[in-house]
């Protein structure tokens, strides 16, 4: 519907000036009991500027930074798994409410929405890919052993900044404690690679991911045509939608 309205506007359709304000049957009277909209910000480009791209890992967004922290720690702990006493994960309220899960995970859908599972895979493998949610990976007893050692705590600053419109952080931090009393460094990641605040890092990786996925479907020549068009904004904006969509039709 939003795209349809944009196209109508570009063609000069002015719409109905009184659709909101008409007495009795206008939107304000029918739905808002006579009150008008009260918006936290002016209509602008905030939503598009703050799009989150899922780049690094196929993980639910509240866990992206936890997996990144886990991958960072992988090299330090991969040979000390049996020595781990506790894995402390500091996170935000939304992550605790939505993806913190204990107990049996029955299928990939359970696993890819479990903070502890995704973190465990990152610690064990130094990566997280889609296949890691399947039964053969989940059946590795080390996964649940690590999950059982995890302690989840809320960091109030993380919860606060998750909701702040100028930040919208998705923070997680991990620190691992060993039986001998030693510990790793606390690894904190506040913004995932796909966040607005990490565009400089994220965009090149996003372009690589786009090209990599194109190559699973199209010939080299078609991929080159699509990439050439999509990396030239001026040309792309002038390209009819039908021509663009034709490039995406299977060969």
Question: For each of these PLM feature ranges, what is it?
Answer:
Residues 7-251:
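Terminal-appendage/accessory-domain detector
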């Amino acid at each position: 519907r939003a795209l349809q309205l944009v196209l109508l506007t570009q063609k000069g359709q002015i719409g109905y000036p009184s659709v909101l304000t008409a007495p009795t049957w206008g939107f304000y009277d029918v739905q808002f009991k006579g009150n008008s909209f009260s918006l936290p910000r002016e209509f602008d480009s905030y939503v598009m500027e703050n799009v989150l791209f899922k780049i690094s890992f196929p993980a639910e967004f509240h866990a992206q930074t936890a997996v990144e922290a886990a991958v960072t720690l992988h090299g330090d702990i991969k040979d000390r798994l049996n020595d781990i006493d506790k894995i402390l994960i500091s996170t935000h309220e939304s992550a605790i409410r939505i993806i913190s899960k204990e107990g049996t995970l029955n299928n990939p859908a359970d696993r890819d929405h479990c903070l502890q599972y995704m973190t465990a895979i990152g610690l064990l493998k130094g990566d997280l890919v889609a296949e890691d949610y399947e039964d053969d990976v989940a059946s590795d007893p080390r996964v649940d052993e690590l999950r059982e050692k995890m302690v989840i705590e809320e960091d109030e600053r993380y919860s606060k900044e998750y909701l702040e419109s100028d930040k919208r952080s998705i923070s997680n931090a991990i620190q691992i404690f060993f039986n001998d009393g030693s510990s790793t460094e606390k690894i904190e990641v506040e913004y995932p690679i796909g966040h607005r605040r990490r565009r400089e890092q994220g965009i090149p990786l996003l372009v690589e991911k786009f090209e990599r996925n194109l190559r699973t479907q199209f010939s080299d020549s078609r991929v080159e045509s699509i990439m050439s068009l999509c990396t030239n904004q001026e040309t792309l904006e002038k390209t009819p939608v039908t021509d663009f969509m034709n490039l995406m039709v299977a060969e």
